[in-house]
Amino acid sequence: MKIALIGYGKMGHAVEKIALERGHSIVCHIDQGEEALMDTPEFRSADVAIEFTTPATAVDNYRRCLAAGVPLVSGTTGWLSRRAEVEKMVADSGLAMFWTSNFSIGVSLF
């Protein structure tokens, strides 16, 4: 699977390590200030984007992923006041989004 990582902190590094160990490839890393990379062919080639950022940037990241045609998994918390907006955005895109607030078990099972 080709994965784009959005947010390259502790969780991003952990996901990358496990993904590579399992034979997946990381097509791009996007960290704070590098959001324009979501407009690149490398990003659009991803099978999925895995996003761990901040509440202030998460919804815009979701929008950019969906606009690029990339389904996403997010572990970012603190944006639920905008849940209806995000649900509509995902439904309108025809793509998928998976969100959970606790990846401690998820990372172990990845």
Where are these regions (language model features)?
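NAD(P)-binding Rossmann-fold cofactor-contacting core
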Residues: 14, 18-39
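Short, acidic/turn-prone active-site loops that include or flank metal/cofactor-
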Residues: 32-35, 77-80, 103
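Glycine-rich adenosine-cofactor-binding loop
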Residues: 2-15
